Design a protein with these regions (language model features):
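Surface-exposed loop/turn elements that mediate protein-protein interactions on large endomembrane-trafficking
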Residues: 1, 25-43, 73-91, 121-177, ...
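Beta-strand-rich domains and repeat architectures in extracellular enzymes and scaffolds
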Residues: 1-25, 54-55
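Short loop/turn positions that demarcate and connect the beta-strands within blades
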Residues: 2-4, 49-53, 95-97, 179-180
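Structural signature of eukaryotic scaffold interfaces centered on beta-propeller domains
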Residues: 7-11, 54-61, 100-107, 115-116, ...
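Short beta-strand elements that form the blades of beta-propeller/WD-repeat-like
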Residues: 13-21, 63-69, 75, 107-119, ...
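Blade-loop segments of beta-propeller domains
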Residues: 35-71, 87-95
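Long, hydrophobic, well-ordered secondary-structure blocks that form the structural core
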Residues: 74-75, 85-113
């Protein structure tokens, strides 16, 4: 606990346990012995600094760790703790609450999800470095969020106690909303990458060779929320952040 601190979140990267915590640290531990190995990178506005330890991803094919940097940049480190490079996605997300989240597909390809706005549909993009391999709109009807201005907001609270974190926003018109701050839509099973959009009932497989392939449909039942209901205060409702 003296090394990690509160709000720890652990994932596996090859032979290491990767732990991020509220102390803005990313640390590697030996998967077999639990022994501390090293810290990776740091939060800072210098050329090798990232903006947050939360919301990044690790690629077992390359042994690299990716963190959100500044101005739409992704800061990449090797598991040896050395800074590797900065990657700037060729497709940028609109202003908050629109978001772009990323995960690896294989050693060369990165998948990105861009949420819908009032002018653009939600999209999945595949990148190979600076090359855009494919951009695909999600095959579901949806409404998008308009950009938020400070004049619209009464209060903002941010929870970062483990995981990627959530932003709680209360608006002047009486509405409220919760927005995930990291990757809540991609996950891996074996060598396959899967995707599920918040509030949607369909799970898709992401592939380099094919368009999005629906593989499962969830019966959301009472957890199915219409777009307008997502902004209502409900004391008897639980926000469905993830279905795995």
């Amino acid at each position: 606990s003296c090394l990690v601190g509160q709000g720890a979140y652990a994932t596996i990267l090859n032979d290491w346990i990767v732990v991020t915590s509220g102390r803005d640290r990313c640390q590697l531990f030996d998967k077999k012995t639990g022994r501390f190995i090293r810290s990776v990178g740091h939060v800072g506005e210098d050329p090798e600094g990232y903006s947050d330890v939360h919301g990044g991803w690790q690629n077992p094919y390359t042994g690299q760790l990716s963190f959100h940097g500044w101005k739409n940049e992704i800061v990449v480190y090797g598991a040896d703790g050395r800074f590797d490079h900065i990657w700037t996605p060729s497709v940028s997300a609109d202003e908050f609450p629109a978001m772009g989240v990323f995960d690896y597909l294989d050693a060369d390809l990165i998948a990105g999800y861009y949420s819908a706005t009032d002018s653009l549909p939600a999209r999945i993009a595949l990148f190979r470095g600076d090359e855009i391999v494919r951009v695909e709109s999600l095959p579901v009807g949806q409404e998008g969020d308009k950009a938020i201005t400070p004049d619209d907001i009464v209060s903002i609270s941010v929870l970062k106690d483990g995981g990627d974190g959530l932003a709680f926003i209360k608006y002047k018109d009486g509405r409220s909303a919760i927005y995930p701050l990291g990757n809540s839509c991609f996950w891996h099973a074996g060598k396959d990458l899967y995707f599920r959009q918040s509030y949607n009932d369909t799970i898709y497989r992401v592939s380099a060779a094919k368009e999005l392939q629906p593989v499962r449909v969830l019966d959301l039942g009472v957890y199915s929320w219409s777009y307008n209901e997502r902004f209502e205060d409900k004391k008897d409702a639980i926000y469905p952040t993830k279905f795995m």
